[in-house]
Each structure stands twice: as structure tokens, then as C-alpha cells.
Amino acid sequence: MSTGNVDQELIRRYLVVVKKLYEEPIPQTARQRRRRKQQLRTRRAQLRELEGRILKQILDRGPDQLCQGVANLALAEKSESSN
């Protein structure tokens, strides 16, 4: 598995967890509120763990790849703003 695929998989998992944070209905009873509160704590912990793994992968790359990635982002933003 290439590092690009790992990055995409981590980002996909991150987005799935973020989506779950906001998809659930608002709890009505005290029991539902307690359960929701626990689920939020769990999901936030999952997000922190995934953020750490994503950041570690980014930082593990060589400085050349990071500079090239930043340059690509700048070009993409410039072309997007011109459209």
C-alpha cells in the first residue's frame, strides 16, 4: 500500500467520524443525553487520534515533498479564485 493510499484512508476515516458527530438526532431523554455525551467523547477522542496520525504522516515526509505540496495548494487556490 502506498503512502498516498494510507493518507486517503485516514482522511476518509476522519471524515466519517466527523459526519457521525452531526448526523444523529438531538436526544430527548436524560438517558439519551448521557449516551450522546459519551458518544461525543468517544468520537472526539477518535478524531484526535486520527488527526495525530495524519499530522505524523505529513511530518514524516521529506521537506521537498512538503514544499511541493504547499506550492501545489497555492496554485490550486490561485486557479480556484480566478474561476
Curated annotation (Swiss-Prot):
GO BP annotations listed: mRNA transport
Record-level Gene Ontology MF annotations: RNA binding
Subcellular location: Host nucleus, Host nucleolus; Host cytoplasm
Record motif Nuclear export signal, residues: 65-76
KW Transport (keyword) present: yes
GO cellular component: host cell cytoplasm; host cell nucleolus
UniProt short sequence motif Nuclear localization signal and RNA-binding (RRE), positions renumbered to this chain: 29-45
UniProtKB keywords: Host cytoplasm, Host nucleus, mRNA transport, RNA-binding, Transport
Record region (Homomultimerization): 17-24
Quaternary structure, from the entry: Homomultimer; when bound to the RRE. Multimeric assembly is essential for activity.
Function: Escorts unspliced or incompletely spliced viral pre-mRNAs (late transcripts) out of the nucleus of infected cells. These pre-mRNAs carry a recognition sequence called Rev responsive element (RRE) located in the env gene, that is not present in fully spliced viral mRNAs (early transcripts). This function is essential since most viral proteins are translated from unspliced or partially spliced pre-mRNAs which cannot exit the nucleus by the pathway used by fully processed cellular mRNAs.
Entry comment, domain topic: The RNA-binding motif binds to the RRE, a stem-and-loop structure present in incompletely spliced viral pre-mRNAs. This region also contains the NLS which mediates nuclear localization. These overlapping functions prevent Rev bound to RRE from undesirable return to the nucleus. When Rev binds the RRE, the NLS becomes masked while the NES remains accessible.
Protein name: Protein Rev
Gene giving rise to this polypeptide: rev
